[in-house]
Amino acid sequence: MTTATLPTRPAREDVTLIALVGLAHSISHFSQLLLAPLFPWLKDAFNVSYAELGLLMTIFFVVSCVVQTLSGFVVDKLGPRPVLFAGLALLGLAAFGFSASQSYWMLALFSVVAGVGNGVFHPVDYTLINRKVHPSRLGHAFSVHGITGSLGWALAPAMLAPLASLYSWRVALMCAGALAFVVLAVLWVYREQLSLDMAAPKKAGAAVNDNEHTLAFLKIPAVWLGIAVVQGVLIVNAFNVGKVRRTALAPA
C-alpha cells in the first residue's frame, strides 16, 4: 500500500494519538530513573554500596532488553493496547514495591518487575505510530516520541529528590507509582484512540511469500550477535552478584 492509497486520517486524531503515545513513553523513561536519584537515601537505608545499587540498574536494563525482544511478538499477536496497559501497570506496581521494600533483594525483585514493564514500550509505540499515524506526520510523531522520553528522564530526579528530601524516599516512590497509574487512567479514558486491528494489511495483487514467517528474522546474523551479547552480560552478572554484594567503594 503506497502513501497515495492510504486513507486520509484527520490531523486531530493523529495529534491525539501522538500525545498519548508520548505520554506513555515519558513514564517509561521516568521509571528508568526511579532509583538512581534516590541512591544516597537507599545506600543508608539498606546499608549497601553504590556498586550494589548500580547492579539494580543492570538488572532492570538487562530484563528490559530481553522483554523488548519478546514483547514484539506479543504485540503482533494481541495488539499494542493491552500490552501498553500491562506495561504501565507493572511500572506502577514496581514503584510501590520499591517503596515498601525491606531488603536489598526486594529491591532486586522489583527491578525485575520494572524491567518487564519497561520492555514493552518501544514495540507498542512504534506499532501504533507506524500503523495509525499518516505518513506525512511520521517525522513529527517520532520527534515527539523522542522528546517525551527525554522529558521523562528530566522529570524523575526533579520530582523524586525533592520529595525524598521533604518527606522520605518511600513517599517519593509512592508518588512515582501514583503517577504511573494516573497516566494509565488517562490512556484508559482515550483507549479507543489506541485500538488497532492487527490483521496484516495486504498489498493489492501482491503474491504471498510462503517462506516468510514470524521467525524469519532469525536468519539475520546481527540478531544472533545481539543475543550472544545479552547472554554474555547475563552470565557475567550471575558470577559477579556475590562479589558485588561484598564490594564497598573506596573512600574518595
Task: State each model region's role.
Residues 36, 222-252:
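Extracytoplasmic gate region of multi-pass secondary transporters
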Residues 2-12, 195-225:
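Juxtamembrane intracellular "pre-TM" segments in multi-pass secondary transporters
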Residues 110-149:
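Cytoplasmic helix-loop-helix junction between adjacent transmembrane helices
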